[in-house]
Amino acid sequence: MWTQHLSPDEACSLQMAAEAKSDMPLVTVLSSSHGPIVKRFRLVDGAVEIKPAAQIHRGHAQTVAVDGPGSLLRLIDSLAPNQALSLGRLEQVGARRPLASQHLRRNGEIARTKEFFVWNNGPACMLLDVDTKSLPETVLNRVAGRDLADVIVDTVPEIETAPMLVKASSSAGIRLPDGKARAASGLHCYVFVADGRQIPEMLCLIHDRLWAAGLGFFTVSRSGGLLERSLVDTTVGSSERLIFAADPIVHPPLTRDPPRPRIFSEGLPLAYVAPPDFELVERMKADAREAIKPAAKVQKKHHETEQIDRVADKFRVPRAEARRIVKQRLEMQILNDDDLLETGRGRFERVADFLGRVTGQTALPCPNEGSDYGMSTAYYYPASDRCPVPRIVSFAHGNITEFHFARFRRLRGLTWIDR
């Protein structure tokens, strides 16, 4: 089993420091009991293949203190491949708590939910998760040749005086056998703040300040939905969010040489982010939304037609019936027995066959977005003591979407009760 690379003395020191100084920033280390959860990189037929990070179904969690960016960096560097961070805290600092998925949770176990993970009522770390992969040309032109952390600080100068750790994402620094480096597209900026409870609001304010500076945009999802974006990801402003900060597993002949992290230790924790001109921001968002609507409409129609054709061809049913089945999934999040689920890249399975085959919790692509968005962006949860019906929960695009099975519709909303 993977273990965190901390000596007993170091672990004890972290716990004692947290208990002795409740005004120190707190983070939580989550450990999986079922193996590595980090990304894996390997070379397949001359191309880099990425296996996405996995979720934690069972393991344990422990809240510890970090006394500044340097301390946080040492903690991150000590993480094993089966570990991740949450910037929220548990009620009891230093205690190692057994962890399980919500539907598997037994007495004495906690789940990675807001019921157990909360923002510290005091100093905490706020993550600015920066990714350039989906930036449109209009935004790329504004940031071309500049460090994105500097762009954010210039746009929101309040951040400049706060302690901060800037670290490249786990995908950065992957090198091919010929020595060429794979382009790094992401940054993790950990900003120390005075009150963790303000983090969700601060992230939204930073997001809107970026919009006001012309650094916001909309993208179109594979299913044709509009996704509001900026240089920072606001979905990480949730106390139970998993942050895959540990180094990835890199299989030879690939190697990894990531950029060196930057530490800014001076200054006081961030206590305030000034609001933007909200009327200006709303006008900019409305204009951007209108500009991209035609493309979204085309993509939505294309996606729907593609899904209908696949169901009609696979099961030899009339297109009208295939359209009904697909619209149930796309518009009502209901999965008919004769619908198709993508359970592997390019591999589709009849819903009824999937229900007959799968007995435990299983990762799969989002039923609407497919494997292009990721291989484990949704999870199938079987019926359990807490819920009498199975379901699929998608986390695509930072949203939680529940898909229910048509055969169990009459049982929806029921829960088991003790007698």
Q: What residue ranges belong to the model's regions?
A:
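Modules that initiate DNA replication and primer synthesis
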Residues: 128-138, 146, 150, 170-215, ...
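Signature for HUH/AEP ssDNA processing cores
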Residues: 1-187, 192-213, 297-312, 316
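Conserved short beta-strand edge segments in small beta-sheet-based binding/regulatory domains
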Residues: 214-222
